[in-house]
């Protein structure tokens, strides 16, 4: 299964979502530690995507250089996205060199701190990074623990050997309804099904008596890799 998508922020201006043709969209919710740092177009983009039946996820751009700062960023992110439904993960966007300068173990702890807060609040957490820092500055546990969205341009496939669900392949896409260039992505994972089955990201959790619960096999495809696991009905 392959889906083609885009990711957007206030830098794309006022998007005419009625003209956009895409399988999914990842929206910037905001950045930093304060609710006041919400992306100026987030509400408009969320409403526009939903009104036009475009499944969406969200991302939060990080400046955190400690676990405590990461938790504060998570709190701001959760405040902004609460009450909404997302078919795709909520991603922690790590790009700042000052974060990478802390080293792999510290970077990984910062990622875990943010994602743990998201999961506690009922969200399906993911990590966005470029291929090189993702390889160099995260532990194997982090690479496999969270949904990975990897950025790598001008290549036929990402220069990254770990599992990933979405590949951001270019920043120069042209999409009707959006003025100027936009990031374009390819998704290999059926996140909407997984997230809805889990009851994450604002979707209702399905409960049933213990004796009627079923266990289903979920297969997640990551480019050349396929990972399977068991998911119990909630």
Place the predicted regions along the sequence by residue.
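Substrate-binding cleft of extracellular glycoside hydrolase catalytic domains
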Residues: 1-115, 119-124
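Functionally critical loop-and-helix segments that line ligand-binding/catalytic clefts
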Residues: 1-18, 141-211
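Flexible, glycine-rich phosphate/dinucleotide-binding loops
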Residues: 34, 65, 134, 157, ...
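Short beta-strand/turn micro-motifs composed of small residues
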Residues: 60, 129, 152
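Glycine-rich, charge-decorated loop segments at or immediately adjacent to ligand/cofactor-binding or catalytic sites
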Residues: 69-72, 133-143
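Structural recognition of alpha->loop->beta junctions
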Residues: 78-92, 96-98, 137-164
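Aromatic-lined carbohydrate-recognition surfaces of secreted/lumenal glycan-active proteins
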Residues: 118-136
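Short, low-complexity, charged amphipathic interaction modules
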Residues: 207-234
């Amino acid at each position: 299964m392959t889906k083609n998508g885009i990711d957007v922020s206030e830098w794309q201006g006022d998007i005419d979502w009625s003209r956009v043709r895409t399988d999914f969209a990842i929206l910037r919710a905001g950045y930093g530690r304060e609710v006041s740092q919400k992306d100026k177009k987030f509400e408009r983009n969320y409403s526009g995507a939903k009104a036009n039946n475009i499944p969406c996820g969200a991302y939060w751009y990080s400046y955190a250089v400690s676990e405590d700062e990461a938790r504060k960023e998570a709190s701001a992110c959760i405040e902004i996205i609460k009450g909404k439904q997302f078919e795709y993960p909520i991603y922690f966007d790590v790009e700042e060199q000052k974060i990478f300068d802390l080293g792999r173990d510290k970077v990984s702890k910062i990622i875990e701190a943010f994602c743990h807060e998201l999961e506690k609040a009922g969200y399906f957490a993911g990590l966005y990074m470029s291929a090189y820092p993702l390889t160099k500055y995260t532990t194997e546990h982090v690479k496999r623990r969270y949904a990975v969205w990897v950025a790598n341009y001008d290549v036929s496939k990402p220069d990254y050997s770990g599992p990933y669900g979405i590949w951001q392949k270019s920043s120069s896409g042209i999409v009707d309804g959006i003025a100027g260039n936009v990031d374009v992505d390819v998704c290999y994972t059926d996140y909407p099904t997984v997230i809805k089955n889990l009851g994450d990201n604002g979707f209702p959790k399905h409960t049933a008596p213990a004796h009627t619960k079923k266990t289903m096999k979920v297969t997640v495809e990551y480019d050349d890799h396929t990972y399977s696991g068991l998911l119990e009905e909630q």
